[in-house]
Amino acid sequence: MLDIHALEKDTLHDIMLQQLYSFNYIWMRFEIFIAMKAPDEYGSEEYYQLHEDFGAYQARRLARVLGTPGEGIGELTRFLKHSHWAAFEDIEVVDLTADSFTMRTLDCSVQRAAKKWGAQHYDCGKGGLRVRTGFFKGINPGAKVQRVFTPPEVGSEGIPANVSCEWLVSIE
């Protein structure tokens, strides 16, 4: 077992970062594999429930480090800053009201990878909605997530071209 207490902090950081990239890579490979080998299951309710379960699980694990979440929209953004999205992507949060914000991914690494592998885009709409729903509801059961746009759509006029997707997050 990795003796994390014997490692220098920078070494441990680098190891964990490489592990994150490895998990992200295999996630993409599994999605492609399932789409090709199990097309009836790919995109099924059970498939998307796994996405939602992952989001909720991530929120629970973060709560072990960050503490039990309090009330309010600020808790959602606090947890978001420590999520896998923040680890892999440039995330922009735009506060709208006391109970809502938009979450934007800038220059999405997954979209870049999809193009590198020959696809026009990665279809993240349904899965992305379910992961975010599980994550934010795992922090606050009153959270609601709505898709504003995801590829192949582009943002409305005035949205910078480097915004890959946008989500509205609120507490009801």
Q: Language-model features: where?
A:
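N-terminal accessory segment detector
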Residues: M1-T102, D107-G127, K137-E172
